[in-house]
Amino acid sequence: MSLSDPIADFLTRLRNGQAGMNKVVYVPCSKVVMAVLRILVEEGYIESFTEEVRGDSGIKVLKVFLKYFNSAAAIRKIVRVSRPGKRVYSSADKMPRFYNALGIYIVSTSKGIMLDSHARNAGVGGEILCGVF
């Protein structure tokens, strides 16, 4: 199956998994998705993730362990900002804040994928991939 937007697919799988109160979600493996997952683990939005090989075909998937607080999902809202049809870029000085800095933006910069606050501090702009609250 060919995906035109693997990040949107990944975010949708997370959203649907938490809506269904699942403990684990499987996501197709990619470097960008792994970088976003590392940030989500560091910020406390998900428990952890591991890389697995599924079946005899040798397809790599990421097993994501979702996080809940008192049976409520740790991620209240997760949205895709920059899409293949409409890219959204921002410079470091004009980087927006998600939910008045209560949430985070994940930004793809020339120095790698990082939080919006780290991009502002480093003085680099980039493509705003998604917002998490």
From Swiss-Prot:
GO CC terms in record: ribonucleoprotein complex; ribosome
Name recorded for this polypeptide: Small ribosomal subunit protein uS8
Molecular-function GO term, any one: rRNA binding
Presence of keyword Ribonucleoprotein: yes
Function per UniProt: One of the primary rRNA binding proteins, it binds directly to 16S rRNA central domain where it helps coordinate assembly of the platform of the 30S subunit.
Organism: Anaplasma phagocytophilum (strain HZ)
Quaternary structure note: Part of the 30S ribosomal subunit. Contacts proteins S5 and S12.
Biological processes annotated in GO: translation
